[in-house]
């Protein structure tokens, strides 16, 4: 009996090591080189410290709605512009969260949205400039379970709000004559990830999400998004851009079931 008692701590230690080694191996594995190959066809990556900024909380309060802000850091005198920004959440089931194409004349300098984060992970922002070069910045986020977290609304409520859009403009500190604008688009949509479970049937809810969004001022492109399952429920984009004097702001969204949602709004002049 004494021999068995003595062996128990040793067995516990060995079991602890057995379970710890796979966890440590997973932690040590860096998926980023493979993602560069798969998403960017192994194109060279330059340090984006002076080109593209990414801001996220180090420890997320809610892994299903983690705020992220992407910001241009190009100097005003730089003749180049950011053509697109790809957001990659390295350890998510579908790492490419979104790709944003920026209108050539819109001068979009900042984009904020909300994403799901499934594991402790690096998150990369890759900017492609008008000269064809890629620049990358990253942050580390502590969050888990965001892709499988239950929806915030029940299925009936989500269906009733499907495709409903809201547009907001925000006052800025620039002089009234400034053409810089700040706006927000919100779309009612469950954006199901395919990893969430129906609490009644205990079956997985099929993936169903906004995969395309186009924003224009009159007919001039401001911003478009190719989205995936990592974009949170009820997609929400807040962004800055330069007005071309358009009177109408338009949005068109498509989802993976083929629905098309459109809306447009009057553009308020600064100070009104």
Task: Indicate where each model-derived feature is located.
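N-terminal edge beta-strand
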Residues: 36-63, 157-180
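Bacterial N-terminal signal peptides
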Residues: 9-18
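Short edge beta-strand/loop segments characteristic of extracellular beta-sandwich folds
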Residues: 55, 67-76, 182-188, 198-203
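Low-complexity, Pro/Ser/Thr- and charge-rich linker/hinge segments at domain boundaries
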Residues: 28, 144-167, 270-272
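Beta-strand signatures of extracellular beta-sandwich domains
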Residues: 84-88, 212-216, 252
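Aromatic sugar-binding surface patches on proteins
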Residues: 103-111, 229-238
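Short acidic/polar inter-strand loop motif in beta-rich domains
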Residues: 129-136, 254-263
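Surface-exposed, short loops/turns at beta-strand junctions within beta-sandwich domains
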Residues: 114-120, 240-246
């Amino acid at each position: 009996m004494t021999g068995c008692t003595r062996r128990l701590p040793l067995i516990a230690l060995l079991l602890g090591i057995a379970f710890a080694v796979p966890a440590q191996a997973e932690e040590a594995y860096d998926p980023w080189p493979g993602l560069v190959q798969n998403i960017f066809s192994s194109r060279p990556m330059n340090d984006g410290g002076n080109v593209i900024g990414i801001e996220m909380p180090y420890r997320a309060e809610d892994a299903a709605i983690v705020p992220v802000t992407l910001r241009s850091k190009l100097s005003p005198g730089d003749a180049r512009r950011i053509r697109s920004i790809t957001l990659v959440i390295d350890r998510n089931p579908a790492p490419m969260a979104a790709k944003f194409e920026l209108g050539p004349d819109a001068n979009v300098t900042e984009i904020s949205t909300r994403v799901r984060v499934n594991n402790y992970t690096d998150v990369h922002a890759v900017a492609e400039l008008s000269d064809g070069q890629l620049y990358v910045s990253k942050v580390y986020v502590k969050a888990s379970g965001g892709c499988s977290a239950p929806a915030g609304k029940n299925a009936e409520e989500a269906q009733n709000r499907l495709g409903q859009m809201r547009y907001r403009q925000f006052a800025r500190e620039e002089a009234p004559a400034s053409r810089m604008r700040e706006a927000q688009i919100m779309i009612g949509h469950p954006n199901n990830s395919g990893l969430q479970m129906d609490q009644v049937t205990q079956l997985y809810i099929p993936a169903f999400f906004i995969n395309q969004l186009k924003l224009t001022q009159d007919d001039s492109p401001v911003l478009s998004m190719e989205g995936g399952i990592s974009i949170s429920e009820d997609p929400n984009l807040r962004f800055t851009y330069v007005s071309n004097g358009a009177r109408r702001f338009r949005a068109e969204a498509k989802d993976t079931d083929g629905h098309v949602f459109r809306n447009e709004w009057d553009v308020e002049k600064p100070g009104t």
